[in-house]
């Protein structure tokens, strides 16, 4: 192990607050309901970390698979309402299974179901953060899942890897651990290339990592591509991300002891401020602003506000306060932010200096299209 790798593993060993995401393949009997013994083993490891003073927040799949088993379904349905029904049936069983196993160690667990709306609304985001912080302070293990019963495709997180990263941001966790049925991230698909090598360590923002990521399996929605994106998102709050196989014995406790297992992705930059993390975590955007080269340069180099003069084109229909994405003229994402004007007004003032806003609109809400406090570089 190199000196830098040793330092990175030591950083994981020193982590005091960890978000652990366990995929459905590691919690179920190949989709035929929950594997209670496997869940018991995960709880044993989490309890061992608690005994070391490590705060653990668990993001757990398994509700849909449990619901499918209880309903007698063999294959995962494609209809959204059937998936929602399965989640509703299975969630209580999942929660009860965790509760019984944590009780063996004198620990309490709490079921927390979140939707993207909970984290996109600033007030609800802060409320969720306060509630989770209180649970952790009480030495209760939060067991978090997406509220599949009420969520729609348009506002879903998409997978529990992304949810885990957003929870890591929410709680300012030191680390995000993504446990899967694969050893980690490889430089090629190990199922088809016998020469594929495990990537022991990398940088979360390395664009080359996305090229070697694959798709998810039959039971879950998350493949390696989602795990790389999750690592990039978690890095915004300074969290490192470990991706490892949940098939290895005692993998969680061994990882947290600094053992070289799986892939470790380190953050590239200093942590974003809390409000910027919230902005960065917004998955739903209402429109797009296409920027000229000058505006791109100013945003990237100085983190300045976005003025109308730097906007070449406005796409989509939106209202004041909506989340927009800013792209360069080649379509590359530059930033996201909350806009000060609706789409009609934005089209009338784009490309114009701020001093002309009142002349063009009859009023001036703000000299900026997006203020720097409401803007995050992506």
Curated annotation (Swiss-Prot):
Cell cycle as UniProt keyword: no
Residue span, PUA domain: 286-364
Pfam families recorded: AA_kinase, PUA
Record SMART domains: PUA (SM00359)
Reactions catalysed, as given in the entry: L-glutamate + ATP = L-glutamyl 5-phosphate + ADP
Residue ranges that the Swiss-Prot or TrEMBL entry lists as coiled coil: none
Keyword terms: Amino-acid biosynthesis, ATP-binding, Cytoplasm, Kinase, Nucleotide-binding, Proline biosynthesis, Transferase
Ligand binding (substrate): 61, 148, 160
Similarity comment: Belongs to the glutamate 5-kinase family.
NCBIfam families: proB
Function, as annotated: Catalyzes the transfer of a phosphate group to glutamate to form L-glutamate 5-phosphate.
Entry protein name: Glutamate 5-kinase
Species of provenance: Chromohalobacter salexigens (strain ATCC BAA-138 / DSM 3043 / CIP 106854 / NCIMB 13768 / 1H11)
Lineage: Bacteria, Pseudomonadati, Pseudomonadota, Gammaproteobacteria, Oceanospirillales
């Amino acid at each position: 192990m190199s000196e830098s790798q040793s330092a990175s593993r030591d950083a994981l060993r020193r982590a005091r607050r960890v978000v652990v995401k366990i995929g459905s393949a590691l919690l179920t009997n190949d989709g035929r309901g929950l594997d209670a013994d496997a869940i018991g083993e995960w709880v044993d490891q989490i309890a061992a970390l608690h005994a070391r003073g490590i705060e653990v927040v668990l993001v757990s799949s398994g509700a849909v698979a449990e619901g499918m088993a209880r309903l007698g379904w063999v294959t995962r349905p494609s209809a959204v309402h059937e998936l929602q029904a399965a989640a509703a049936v299975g969630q209580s069983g999942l929660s009860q299974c965790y509760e019984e196993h944590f009780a063996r160690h004198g620990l309490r667990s709490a079921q927390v179901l979140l939707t993207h709306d909970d984290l996109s609304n600033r007030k609800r985001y802060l409320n969720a953060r306060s509630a989770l912080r209180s649970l952790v302070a009480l030495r209760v293990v939060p067991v978090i899942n997406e509220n599949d019963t009420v969520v729609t495709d348009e506002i879903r997180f998409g997978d529990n890897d992304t949810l885990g990263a957003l929870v890591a941001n929410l709680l300012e966790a030191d680390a995000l651990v993504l446990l899967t049925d694969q050893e980690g991230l490889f430089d090629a698909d190990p199922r088809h290339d016998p020469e594929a090598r495990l990537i022991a360590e990398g940088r979360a923002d390395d664009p080359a990592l996305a090229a070697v990521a694959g798709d998810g399996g039959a039971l879950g929605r998350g493949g390696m591509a989602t795990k790389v994106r999750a690592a990039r998102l978690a890095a915004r709050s300074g969290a490192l991300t470990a991706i490892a196989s949940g098939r290895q014995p005692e993998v969680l406790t061994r990882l947290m002891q600094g053992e070289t297992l799986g892939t470790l992705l380190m953050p590239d930059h200093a942590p974003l401020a809390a409000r910027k993390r919230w902005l960065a975590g917004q998955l739903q955007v209402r429109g797009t602003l296409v920027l000229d080269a000058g505006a791109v340069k100013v945003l990237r180099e100085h983190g300045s506000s976005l003025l109308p003069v730097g906007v070449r084109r406005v796409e989509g229909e939106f209202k004041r306060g909506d989340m927009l994405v800013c792209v360069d003229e080649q379509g590359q994402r530059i930033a996201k932010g909350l806009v000060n004007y609706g789409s009609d007004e934005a089209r009338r003032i784009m490309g114009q200096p701020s001093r002309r806003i009142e002349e063009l609109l009859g009023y001036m809400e703000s000299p900026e299209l997006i203020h720097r406090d409401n803007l995050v570089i992506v």
